């Protein structure tokens, strides 16, 4: 892998390698773009096949956070960390303390958070060494469990997509097929049930399905049958890549709006559902409630302020749909364009984030 050529191609700013022999820390911090502000992105711990695979993952995820944060209207850039190791057996306090010192050494250019393979407890240890971390324990002033807030954002985004498809954002009487009934999807189902939507649910966790059936009057189906249900809205809220060659021919929904990440297996599947007239709410726009919520911690967490910002996901989806119509492009491309246009407007007046007295961190 020719690192500098790759970084130049996608306009990355910085790649930081962090090593601590005593604790076993091997971490890679990727900072993609800080035009809008310091880079925010979680720390992932994973057993990568090679160091090159870890680098590629860090770079890819950091770029994704640039787009997610920009589209969400946050004054934050995109970054990501990967720690090479098995989160089940390689963790220790010294590792996360050492990592916290490396973050502190970046002087605010990068702010971390929990991700796959890391926990709130890990973030608390990092917090012992630096303030540039979010998603810590509520005892330290954090926002707590982000799932209800993420679900609320998905609910608002779904209403915006429904308005485009059906002429009204009311979900009363609409049938929504929800794939996955985990923490986020359960809270989404609660909002939908309260508005009077009819629910079809599936999950590999039978207890979660039974709970949704009992509490929301949902109808349960087998996991493989969720795609072919007669419904108005398909809400993927579990694994990614569920919009693919096998599932698209089965879909009867007019809207796809859910909490899952990386819903399109390939970009061409976004083209395909666009050509079919399906209104697709791009994943990283509609599921941004979690990152909006933790970002509010940087101001000193205020739940009312955070929820008001999350409600803005409705308008963000509307803008994506407007760009899609304006430029005659699928919504997944329109989401990228929304983020890129915001970054470009800011780039006119600043080129990169450097610590100063007038930015988001000065409010902490």
UniProtKB/Swiss-Prot annotation:
Pfam family for this entry, one = ELFV_dehydrog
InterPro entries in the cross-refs: Aminoacid_DH-like_N_sf, Glu/Leu/Phe/Val/Trp_DH, Glu/Leu/Phe/Val/Trp_DH_C, Glu/Leu/Phe/Val/Trp_DH_dimer, Glu/Leu/Phe/Val_DH_AS, Glu/Phe/Leu/Val/Trp_DH_bac/arc, NAD(P)-bd_dom_sf
UniProt GO molecular function: L-leucine dehydrogenase activity
The UniProt entry annotates the active site at: 80
Top EC class of this enzyme? oxidoreductase
Q: Does the keyword 4Fe-4S apply?
A: no
Q: How does activity depend on temperature?
A: Thermostable. Retains full activity on heating at 65 degrees Celsius for 1 hour, but loses the activity completely on heating at 70 degrees Celsius for 1 hour.
Task: List the pathway annotation.
Answer: Amino-acid degradation; L-leucine degradation; 4-methyl-2-oxopentanoate from L-leucine (dehydrogenase route): step 1/1
Catalytic activity reads: L-leucine + NAD(+) + H2O = 4-methyl-2-oxopentanoate + NH4(+) + NADH + H(+)
Give the pH dependence.
Optimum pH is 10.3 for the oxidative deamination of L-leucine.
Q: Which SUPFAM superfamilies match?
A: Aminoacid dehydrogenase-like, N-terminal domain, NAD(P)-binding Rossmann-fold domains
Q: Which CDD domains match?
A: NAD_bind_Leu_Phe_Val_DH
User: In its keyword annotation, does this UniProt entry include NAD?
Assistant: yes
Q: What does this protein do?
A: Catalyzes the reversible deamination of L-leucine to 4-methyl-2-oxopentanoate. Can also use other substrates such as L-isoleucine, L-valine and L-2-aminobutyrate. The 2-oxo analogs of branched-chain and straight-chain amino acids serve as good substrates for the reverse reaction.
Q: What is this protein called?
A: Leucine dehydrogenase
Gene name tied to this protein? ldh
């Amino acid at each position: 892998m020719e690192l500098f050529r790759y970084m130049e191609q996608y306009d990355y700013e910085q790649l930081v390698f962090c090593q601590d022999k005593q604790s076993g820390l091997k971490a890679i911090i990727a900072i993609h773009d800080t035009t809008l502000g310091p880079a925010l992105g979680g720390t992932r711990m994973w057993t990568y096949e090679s160091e090159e695979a870890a680098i590629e993952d860090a770079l890819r995820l950091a770029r994704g956070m640039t787009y997610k944060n920009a589209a969400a209207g946050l004054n934050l850039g995109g970054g990501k960390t990967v720690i090479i190791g098995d989160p089940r057996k390689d963790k220790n306090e010294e590792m996360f303390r050492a990592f916290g010192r490396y973050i502190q050494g970046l002087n605010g250019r990068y702010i971390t958070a929990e991700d796959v393979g890391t926990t709130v407890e890990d973030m608390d240890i990092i917090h012992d060494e630096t303030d540039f971390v979010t998603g810590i324990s509520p005892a330290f002033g954090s926002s707590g469990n982000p799932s209800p807030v993420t679900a609320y954002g998905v609910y608002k985004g779904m209403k915006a997509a429904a308005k485009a498809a059906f002429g009204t954002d009311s979900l009363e009487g609409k049938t929504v097929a929800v794939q996955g009934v985990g923490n986020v999807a359960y809270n989404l189902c609660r909002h939908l049930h309260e508005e009077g939507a009819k629910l079809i649910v599936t999950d590999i966790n039978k207890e979660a399905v039974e709970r949704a059936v009992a509490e929301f009057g949902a109808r349960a189906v087998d996991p493989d049958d969720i795609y072919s249900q007669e419904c108005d809205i398909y809400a993927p809220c579990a694994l990614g890549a569920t919009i693919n060659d096998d599932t698209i021919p089965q879909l009867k929904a007019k809207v796809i709006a859910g909490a899952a990440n990386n819903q399109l297996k390939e970009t061409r599947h976004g083209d395909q559902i666009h050509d079919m007239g399906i209104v697709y709410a791009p994943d990283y726009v509609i599921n941004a409630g979690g990152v909006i919520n933790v970002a509010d911690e940087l101001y000193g967490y205020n739940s009312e302020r955070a929820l008001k910002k999350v409600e803005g996901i409705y308008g963000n989806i509307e803008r994506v749909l407007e760009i899609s119509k304006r430029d005659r492009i699928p919504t997944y491309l329109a989401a990228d364009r929304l983020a890129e246009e915001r970054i470009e407007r800011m780039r006119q007046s600043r080129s990169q984030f450097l610590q100063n007295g007038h930015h988001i961190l000065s409010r902490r």
